[in-house]
Amino acid sequence: MQWSDEAIILGIRRHGESSVIAEVMTPGHGRHLGLVRSGRSRTMQPVLQPGNSVEVSWRARLDEHLGEFRVEPLQLRAASLIETATSVYGIQALGALLRLLPERDPHPHLYEALAVIVDHLQDPADAGELFVRFELAVLNDLGFGLDLSRCGATGARSELVYVSPKSGRAICREAGAPYADRMLALPDFLSGGSRAADHESLAAAFRLTAYFLNRHVYEPRGVDAASARDGFVHATLKALKSASSAA
């Protein structure tokens, strides 16, 4: 059994004296693990860092085996990803989200989204918005997608300012007003509005996705959300607040 694909490194762990087991995200083969012989060598260590884009060739005697990776560098961005807290926490949090999905299950749109996000992790506003959209996409692929396109009560497509915590559907201002204290806020940038993401709207967006991830994924599985997500959210909102104050 063998295949080749482009990939983004999610993480590695030591294996034996000189090898590592690499975890990658690929467009055609999903999240995949493989042994990299001499992966701890001076040549390979800089390549096998989270966030780097590589070409992987996987080979195993049987499909269910761990198999081995041969890895060639494509774009080494890991050095820049350690320069800011948003990028350090961001790449860890993205990997944790992808681990919610079954191993070897292809999600090409998530791979494409990941490739975009890793190049924007140092820009807090872009990174925050892209991360929230990534969480929504993961929820959707797990079968818990939110419907933010129209009001779940009236069918209206305008003035969508709430999300029902029960149905996961958008609710317009008029229909949701009597129950506003029980609703989740829907930021303008997630409802097709023209306002760019800022500190306030991103904070609301992070609360929105956290609620549904906890309800549908973490609590049923009996696990906690990755601490890296909290780190990313804190770093992103702090950076946006500082930028706003400076302006």
UniProtKB/Swiss-Prot annotation:
Encoding gene per record: recO
Gene3D superfamilies to which the protein is assigned, alphabetical: Nucleic acid-binding proteins, Recombination protein O, C-terminal domain
Annotated transmembrane regions: none
Physiological role: Involved in DNA repair and RecF pathway recombination.
Protein known as: DNA repair protein RecO
SUPFAM superfamilies in the cross-refs: ArfGap/RecO-like zinc finger, Nucleic acid-binding proteins
Family matches, as Pfam families: RecO_C (PF02565), RecO_N (PF11967)
Alphabetized UniProt keyword annotations: DNA damage, DNA recombination, DNA repair
InterPro entries, sorted: ARFGAP/RecO (IPR037278), DNA_rep/recomb_RecO_N (IPR022572), NA-bd_OB-fold (IPR012340), RecO (IPR003717), RecO_C (IPR042242)
Native organism taxonomy: Bacteria, Pseudomonadati, Pseudomonadota, Alphaproteobacteria, Hyphomicrobiales
The keyword Transferase belongs to this UniProt entry's keyword annotation: no
Lineage: superkingdom: Bacteria
Family matches, as PANTHER family: DNA REPAIR PROTEIN RECO
Family statement drawn from the similarity comment of this UniProt entry: Belongs to the RecO family.
A cellular-component GO term for this protein: bacterial nucleoid
Range of residues in the leader sequence: none
GO BP terms in the entry: DNA recombination; double-strand break repair
